[in-house]
């Protein structure tokens, strides 16, 4: 995600990164895939059929996308809020951004949007810097704030991945989370780091929670729900 897509406000928010490195040209325009187009069309029809009647928006990748099928019981907790799940497997920040800029936020007025995105930026490209992934997350937050000014955003830390705390990807995830935490304003953007909830006291990510070291199973989704439900209840008031 190139820095040229960030507004001065977002750049100021990420002031801790004095000069974001020039990124590879991973722009929304070059992020489109056949899968994206197909799922995007499905989402647009879903929005039209429901006449935009959704109170809760979920934005993310396969981790978000898989919740309804992998843990129906926990996902059912959102039913009273009429959720719209905009997760797509494998997506990076620039692909999510393309979708949000091309209609998926139009005609809806959710009370809360929960955003968890960025792990595929870090996992799919070994040279992807945390600053680049954070810039993509920042642009997504900015886009939601612009298109849905009355919607509160619950921005989550990128979930831990890989079993051991010493694994290299863990450090990059942590560095990215440290950056996106700066987007918290305590009013319309609430940042919540729930990393510890998934880990043992020693920092291990067990197969009992994420069998492949990335995607939650039913137990992992229960942990996710327990970690965010009180905050969501407050934001939904």
Regions found by a protein language model. Give the residues of each.
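Acidic/histidine-rich helix-loop elements
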Residues: 27-31, 68, 85-93, 123-129, ...
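Catalytic His-Asp segment of secreted/periplasmic serine-dependent ester chemistry enzymes
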Residues: 160-237
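Proline-centered flexible-loop/turn and helix-kink motifs
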Residues: 79, 149-150, 185
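N-terminal secretory targeting modules
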Residues: 1-59, 63-72, 76-77, 146, ...
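Oxyanion-hole/transition-state-stabilizing segment in secreted/luminal serine hydrolases
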Residues: 65-79, 93-138, 143, 154, ...
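Extracytoplasmic/secreted proteins, especially bacterial periplasmic and envelope-associated proteins
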Residues: 42, 58, 91, 95, ...
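Structural recognition of the beta-strand scaffold that forms the well-ordered cores
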Residues: 55-60, 82-87, 112-117, 152-157, ...
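Short, glycine/acidic-enriched loop or turn micro-motifs at the edges of active sites
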Residues: 64, 90, 196
């Amino acid at each position: 995600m190139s820095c040229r897509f960030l507004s001065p406000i977002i750049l100021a928010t990420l002031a801790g990164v004095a000069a974001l490195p020039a990124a590879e040209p991973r722009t929304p325009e070059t992020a489109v895939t056949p899968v994206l187009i197909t799922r995007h069309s499905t989402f647009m029809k879903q929005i039209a059929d429901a006449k935009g009647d959704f109170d809760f928006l979920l934005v993310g990748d396969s981790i978000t996308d898989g919740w309804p099928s992998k843990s129906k019981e926990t996902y059912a907790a959102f039913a009273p809020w009429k959720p719209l799940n905009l997760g797509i497997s494998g997506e990076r920040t620039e692909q999510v951004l393309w979708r949000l800029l091309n209609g998926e936020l139009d005609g809806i007025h959710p009370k809360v949007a929960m955003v968890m995105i960025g792990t595929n930026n870090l996992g799919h490209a070994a040279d992807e810097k945390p600053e680049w992934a954070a810039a993509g997350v920042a642009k997504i937050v900015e886009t939601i704030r612009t298109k849905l000014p009355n919607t509160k955003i619950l921005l989550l830390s990128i979930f831990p991945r890989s079993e051991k705390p010493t694994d290299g990807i863990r450090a990059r995830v942590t560095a990215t989370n440290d950056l996106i935490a700066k987007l918290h304003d305590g009013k319309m953007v609430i940042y919540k780091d729930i990393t510890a909830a998934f880990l043992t006291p020693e920092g291990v990510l067990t197969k009992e929670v994420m069998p492949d070291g990335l995607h939650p199973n039913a137990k992992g989704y229960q942990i996710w729900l327990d970690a965010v439900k009180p905050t969501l209840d407050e934001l939904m008031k």
